[in-house]
Amino acid sequence: MERNKASRPQEVLDLVHERQHGPIDRRSFLHGAGRFAVGGLTAGAVFQTMRPNSVSAQPAAKETHAASARVLERLRTRFTFQISVDVATLEQGRAVAAAALAGGVTIVEMGTPLLKNQGVSNVVPAFRTQFPEALLLADMKTMDGGGFEARAVYAGGGNIIDFLALAGADTAKAICAVRDEFRRAGAELPRLVFADIMVPHQGPAAQAIEVAHRMLEAGVDAVGVHLQSDARRADSKLIESDYLGDMARAIFERIGKAAPVQVVGGLSIAQAKSLARAGMRAFVISGNLGQPDTRARYDLPPAEIQRYVAGFIAEVSSAQQSQ
């Protein structure tokens, strides 16, 4: 049974519709509806009386934020490419990022070496100033103090913080709480949280899938399947085999309809094309620039970096999904 909406003034009905569908925030709704609060019925209660009178509780949904939702939908359904700017200096980092953007990347990742060498409070504002329209991700590899680190990224103009899923649900929730705070403060900038699942450490596949589910339950927006750089340098079989691809497919098959799944860690063009045919859409270009080895190529001239990046994007985007 639903409460009688006809007993409410039309102005209240209009306010409720606007609140439910996004044009006004909670504060504006309460201010407007407060004019109609009578008999001890608060504006908040007015809003509650407009909801269906159902006893079946629904799980709490994430707060909607249109700018963030658009990015997530793109990551899930369209080809997106991220460059990991894993260098030590701001000068080189800016040059690599500019070349990659010219090559067509969707997201610029301020890599962990750059953030640790130069400092978050220096790198993030510098990249935002130079690349005002770019989606900026900070690969913080956070293991604790998640709220503090997320605040530094968002305050500097970053769009996405990437932390280690190994940190657990409490850190994930702390980061997501700060994300939500910044979303409420501004509608224009996307604010997202990605969790990196480090493999082989967090393998095998069954364990990695469980971790992915826990991260989504904690509120993160997307997960990355990240082949650890030390591991792939120590064991060449991780590169020669399709270990990363197998892990990524397993996770994508289980959560890919619910959230974007990125593939990270020395990804080659051939691997990325195979994953694209399996339906995956979010890829990270590492220092090897899509070549089937572990050699970093960020010391190449910018025009060469741009050529490698553009080639990676063109090759992978042309892969047809298997039916």
Residues covered by each model-derived region:
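N-terminal export leaders
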Residues: 26-38, 42
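Hydrophobic faces of well-ordered beta-strands that scaffold small-molecule active sites
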Residues: 79-85, 108-110, 136-140, 161-163, ...
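Conserved N-terminal beta1-alpha1 strand-loop-helix module at the mouth
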Residues: 65-135, 143-145, 300, 304
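Conserved anion-binding
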Residues: 156-239
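C-terminal segment of N-terminal export signals and the immediately downstream linker at the start
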Residues: 23-24, 44-78
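C-terminal helical cap(s) of enzyme catalytic domains, especially alpha/beta-barrels
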Residues: 290-322
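Catalytic cores of alpha/beta
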Residues: 145-153, 205-215, 267-282
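N-terminal secretory signal peptides
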Residues: 1-28, 50-52
